[in-house]
UniProtKB/Swiss-Prot annotation:
The reaction(s) this protein catalyses: RNA(n) + a ribonucleoside 5'-triphosphate = RNA(n+1) + diphosphate
Keywords: DNA-directed RNA polymerase, Nucleotidyltransferase, Transcription, Transferase
SUPFAM superfamilies assigned: RPB6/omega subunit-like
Keyword Lipid metabolism applies: no
Species this protein is from: Bacillus subtilis (strain 168)
Complex and partners: RNAP is composed of a core of 2 alpha, a beta and a beta' subunit. The core is associated with a delta subunit, and at least one of epsilon or omega. When a sigma factor is associated with the core the holoenzyme is formed, which can initiate transcription.
Name of the protein this chain belongs to: DNA-directed RNA polymerase subunit omega
GO biological process, one term: DNA-templated transcription initiation
Domain of life of the source: Bacteria
Biological function: Promotes RNA polymerase assembly. Latches the N- and C-terminal regions of the beta' subunit thereby facilitating its interaction with the beta and alpha subunits. In vitro reconstitution experiments this subunit is dispensible.
NCBIfam families given in the database record: rpoZ
């Protein structure tokens, strides 16, 4: 079973596509800057760590209005 679960992650963001985009961008940022918001993570991989940050409510996403 995956932790965090997809159900708990979907409560934080509006779609699976947004979830993938936000977690991939954050994972790339962690690789470059070597920083993470959670001290002790379950996952050893960057994407897993990013998903844990999203589940903890440490990352958010705002849609930009394009007019």
């Amino acid at each position: 079973m995956l932790d965090p679960s997809i159900d708990s992650l979907m409560n934080k963001l509006d779609s699976k596509y947004t979830l993938v985009t936000v977690s991939a961008r954050r994972a790339r940022e962690m690789q470059i800057k070597k920083d993470q918001m959670i001290e002790h993570t379950i996952s050893h991989k960057y994407v897993g760590k990013a998903l844990e940050e999203i589940d903890a409510g440490l990352l958010s996403f705002e849609k930009e209005d394009r007019e």
